[in-house]
Regions:
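Secondary-structure transition motif
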Residues: 1-113
């Protein structure tokens, strides 16, 4: 069974927080003050949970990719800055995922060199 977890970015305190419960009556606050990010049910090479909004470094067919984890039509992808999408898949062979930050605390990691 898939584990369902969320975290939020607290814009007021500028820090990431784990969601322990949700009150859907106040759901409008989630998008405005607290952007909600879902757990992908995948771990990186260091055993860290991968969430939506994480910046991930990965390899595909020996290509180095840095991008943001996002959900598209029910599937998790890594979107690089060049409008390319790569499926987020558990580690196998030469495919290795590593969380290097997130879009709120480490946006500079997405800037092209």
């Amino acid at each position: 069974m898939r584990e369902i977890k969320f975290r939020v970015w607290d814009k007021n305190e500028c820090k990431m927080k784990v969601v322990k419960e949700m009150n859907l009556k106040e759901a409008n606050l989630i998008n405005d003050l607290f952007p909600l990010m879902q757990y992908t049910n995948c771990y990186d090479i260091n055993g860290k949970e991968i969430y939506e909004g994480d910046i991930v470094e990965t390899t595909r067919a020996f290509n180095h990719i840095v991008g943001v984890v996002t959900m598209i039509k029910g599937c998790w992808y890594i979107q690089d800055g060049k409008d390319s999408y790569y499926r987020l898949i558990p580690r196998y062979g030469t495919c290795v995922n590593k969380v290097i930050g997130n879009v709120y605390e480490n946006k500079s990691l997405l800037e092209e060199e």
